[in-house]
Regions:
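N-terminal amphipathic alpha-helical segments
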Residues: 1-47, 101-117, 123, 134
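Alpha-helical bundle protein-protein interaction modules that mediate dimerization/oligomerization
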Residues: 48-201
Length: 202
């Protein structure tokens, strides 16, 4: 069985998150604890259809959690701030799926492993995802700027540019290197949105 620290080291460090660091830390801990007992769950499950489905459901839930963590470590900071409410839902979905998966598996594994599942479920009950107030405010400010831009056209008003610059600074985009990284992340996001024909994201 893998050690929790070993799984966590291979997956995610809190410093990897460009934004929503506390939520990433909580989800990463959740992911690592379940992943550390997953081989035991897989080995102990019944070879029935229900057992296979339960393990598959839990595996899918873990993959969803991993995707969210990677999203927050690779995506644009500006986008993560603007789409904060959507990102919050992205965290809630794998948490709920992991809980459901553990409950299914709990009924088909030996008592000793079922107890480990229950311990994790008890911990999950105490996990409450919430947006960082500062990041949420920056996102609101950026949305306001974008809405003003749509109403006024392609404005180059100095006060708007300064406000945008301050938002970037509050998100930690303070050097030319960080600005370049952000531009690359935005470019990838726009290219993906165009490929998916996602006009809202674009």
């Amino acid at each position: 069985m893998m050690d929790v620290a070993e799984v966590e080291e291979n997956l995610f460090a809190a410093s990897d998150a460009k934004l929503h660091g506390e939520m990433c830390k909580a989800l990463s801990t959740m992911y690592c604890k379940v992943s550390s007992i997953f081989p035991s769950l897989e080995a102990a499950r019944h070879r029935s259809k229900a057992g296979i489905e339960a393990i598959c459901s839990l595996h899918v839930a873990l993959e969803k959690a991993k995707d969210v963590l990677q999203h927050c470590s690779q995506c644009s900071k500006l986008y993560l701030a603007i789409a904060a409410d959507v990102v919050l839902l992205k965290f809630e979905k794998p948490k709920s799926a992991i809980k459901d998966g553990l409950k299914q598996v709990e009924d088909i594994v030996p008592r000793s492993i079922a107890c480990q599942c229950q311990e994790i479920l008890n911990e999950l009950e105490g996990v409450k995802f919430a947006l960082d107030p500062t990041e949420k405010q920056v996102g609101a400010d950026l949305i306001s700027l974008l809405q003003q831009g749509r109403q006024c056209g392609d404005s180059s008003d100095a006060s708007e540019l300064e406000c945008f610059h301050q938002c970037a600074i509050r998100l930690g985009i303070t050097s030319s290197r960080e600005a370049l990284t952000e531009r690359r992340s935005l470019k990838k996001l726009i290219e993906r949105a165009r490929a998916e024909e996602d006009n809202q994201k674009e």
